[in-house]
């Protein structure tokens, strides 16, 4: 019996060092409709393929966090990676820059992807 307890403890100790595989998120920033200056639109940031699920996503206007942002529920794909959609209403113009900033354990610093109005 004592041998079984020792073996069980060794197995548990070895398992505690295992960590889930980490996957960096793919970040896509796009508008719902083609950009037209002065015409209301939606800015989307689709973050996909990441693991673990703990993530921070911010939409930015001229480098500052946009406060009125909504998002989908956290969902997962067949491969157990996660995805989310963050979005907000905005009205594009020539001077403002928009971006999506993502913080995840796979990044040493937050990653920012700018919106390209021509995509």
Swiss-Prot record:
Pfam families noted in UniProt: C1-set
Q: Which UniProt keywords apply?
A: Disulfide bond, Immunity, Immunoglobulin domain, MHC I, Secreted, Signal
Q: Which residues form the Ig-like C1-type domain?
A: 25-114
Q: Which SUPFAM superfamilies match?
A: Immunoglobulin (SSF48726)
Task: Output the InterPro entries linked to this UniProt entry.
Answer: B2Microglobulin (IPR015707), Ig-like_dom (IPR007110), Ig-like_dom_sf (IPR036179), Ig-like_fold (IPR013783), Ig/MHC_CS (IPR003006), Ig_C1-set (IPR003597), MHC/Immunoglobulin (IPR050160)
The record lists its disulfide bonds as 45-100
A single GO cellular-component term from the record reads:
MHC class I protein complex
Q: Which GO terms describe its biological process?
A: antigen processing and presentation of peptide antigen via MHC class I; immune response
The entry's localization annotation reads: Secreted
Annotated signal peptide: 1-20
Relate the protein's function as given in its record.
Component of the class I major histocompatibility complex (MHC). Involved in the presentation of peptide antigens to the immune system.
- Give the family this protein belongs to, as stated in its UniProt record: Belongs to the beta-2-microglobulin family.
Q: How does it assemble?
A: Heterodimer of an alpha chain and a beta chain. Beta-2-microglobulin is the beta-chain of major histocompatibility complex class I molecules.
What's the protein called, per UniProt?
Answer: Beta-2-microglobulin
Native organism is Leontopithecus chrysopygus
């Amino acid at each position: 019996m004592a041998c079984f307890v020792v073996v069980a403890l060794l197995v548990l100790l070895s398992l505690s060092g295992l960590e889930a595989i980490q996957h960096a998120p793919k970040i896509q920033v796009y508008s719902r409709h083609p950009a037209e200056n002065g015409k209301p639109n939606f800015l989307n940031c689709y973050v996909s393929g990441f693991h673990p699920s703990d993530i921070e996503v911010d939409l930015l206007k001229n480098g500052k966090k946009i406060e009125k942002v909504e998002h989908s529920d956290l969902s997962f794909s067949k491969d157990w990676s996660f995805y989310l959609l963050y979005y907000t209403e905005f009205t594009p113009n020539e001077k403002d820059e928009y971006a999506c900033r993502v913080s995840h354990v796979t990044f040493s610093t937050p990653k920012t992807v700018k919106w390209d109005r021509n995509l």
